[in-house]
């Protein structure tokens, strides 16, 4: 038993020592007279075929401002080295050998659109070679490539970033670069971007320096932005802020906060606009979709502030500034009020105006009744005058627009009546009393007329507020739906990211 174990152990040791000896001998035979600068082909007039592919492991970063894509990629290059072939029977147990960087020939394939400071960002690994001379080179690397970022549909955008690989010094007559499909089976998902696909294309390009074509392999990485983050942090707050701007038209003009609310909303949108500008590239090729929405919302809010100033001007209009123009009264108080189904306060409770031919204001009757009375009633003359004024009704003028007949009494007609009924010169007390009555009546008439003018302007301000509320609401809804849904993949982004 012990003898058999000893024999087995000795055989295994002898086998290992023999295998190590064969491998050492193979390395010595292969590198003997081998020149890493020589292209390993049997016929120098024929090109060496190199098969190229890549494995995309991770999208690490997409820098929109600097337009740089950072990816974790494993390159895959295979070719046949004519000088690295051996007979497997002469070297039993040695199936593959590995050569470090610089010891054998390798294709100088680089990323053409590299944005890395070192340009070549690969980690140079060993080259795996089998007995038939088949070489396999798998260098990993963190690649930074320049990528044109089209922010037109941000944040519902899909980017197409290209990775162009090719030999830096070998032309198509010396090195035939062939493409193989990219491998994304080991891809690690990214929190900001979804990988749509990786498509490869081989092409040949002629440069002015050389007559021979230079083949290259271009892999197009298609990625779609995940919009949940931007929707919660930019879009939804903007929609809410634009909705708050509509509250400007619901605030009463006497509150004194209409302008403050409009300016506050405008400043809030400006802050969000600055946040978008910080992450977007400084390009004039296209305006981002979210910037278009912010700009339209800012225009709406800015116009609401302007309209609010007009509303406040109407509401606090000075009666001494004149009556409302006829066209303004027709447009606002008639057409717009009818369209908005608005009625003036107290419009249904109008005192009936007097008829021109039947009952007119007559201060003379008051005066004559006071004069015809006995002397004992002189102490109640002021009371009689007030009673007469209180029961007076006058017809409105056609251009006044005031429905209360008492307000629109013609001062010239009343003064004529008062002067027509002047008392005799022998009664100075009655003359003074009637003079005071005329003054009080004139003050009441002016006060009522001013209140009527103010009421007209205030009602016009309410009509403008209601009209702008409806118009701005419709415009805001149309802008929100029209701009955001114009993105080609809006429905796909909402269904995948917000579901």
Curated annotation (Swiss-Prot):
Regulation of catalytic or functional activity: Activated by a myriad of ligands such as acetylcholine, cytisine, nicotine, choline and epibatidine. Oligomeric amyloid-beta protein 42 activates specifially CHRNA7:CHRNB2 nAchRs. Activity is modulated by positive allosteric modulators (PAMs), such as flavonoids, with a wide range of chemical diversity, pharmacological sensitivity and efficacy. AChR activity is inhibited by the antagonists alpha-conotoxons RgIA, ImI and ImII, small disulfide-constrained peptides from cone snails. Alpha-conotoxin PnIC selectively inhibits CHRNA7:CHRNB2 over CHRNA7 homopentamer.
GO BP term (any one): positive regulation of MAPK cascade
Tissue: At least in chromaffin cells.
Signal peptide region: 1-19
Keyword Oxidoreductase on entry: no
S-S bonds: 147-161, 209-210
Extracellular topological segments: 20-230
Cell compartment(s), UniProt: Postsynaptic cell membrane; Cell membrane
Cytoplasmic topological domain: 313-466
Main location as per UniProt: membrane
Coiled-coil blocks: none
Top-level division of the source organism's lineage: Eukaryota
Residue ranges of the TM segments: 231-251, 259-279, 292-312, 467-487
Topology of the protein relative to the lipid bilayer: Multi-pass membrane protein
Positions annotated with a glycan in the UniProt record: 43, 87, 130
Pfam family, one: Neur_chan_memb
Catalyzed reactions: Ca(2+)(in) = Ca(2+)(out); K(+)(in) = K(+)(out); Na(+)(in) = Na(+)(out); choline(out) = choline(in)
Entry-linked SUPFAM superfamilies: Neurotransmitter-gated ion-channel transmembrane pore (SSF90112), Nicotinic receptor ligand binding domain-like (SSF63712)
GO molecular function, one term: protein homodimerization activity
Binding positions (Ca(2+)): 39, 41, 169, 207
Family according to the record: Belongs to the ligand-gated ion channel (TC 1.A.9) family. Acetylcholine receptor (TC 1.A.9.1) subfamily. Alpha-7/CHRNA7 sub-subfamily.
NCBIfam families per record: LIC
Record's function text: Component of neuronal acetylcholine receptors (nAChRs) that function as pentameric, ligand-gated cation channels with high calcium permeability among other activities. nAChRs are excitatory neurotrasnmitter receptors formed by a collection of nAChR subunits known to mediate synaptic transmission in the nervous system and the neuromuscular junction. Each nAchR subunit confers differential attributes to channel properties, including activation, deactivation and desensitization kinetics, pH sensitivity, cation permeability, and binding to allosteric modulators.
SUBUNIT field: Homopentamer. Homooligomer of the short form gives rise to unfunctional channels, as does coexpression of both long and short forms of the receptor. Can also form heteropentamers with CHRNB2, mainly found in basal forebrain cholinergic neurons. Interacts with RIC3; which is required for proper folding and assembly. Interacts with LYPD6. Interacts with CANX.
Name under which the protein is recorded: Neuronal acetylcholine receptor subunit alpha-7
Organism: Bos taurus (Bovine)
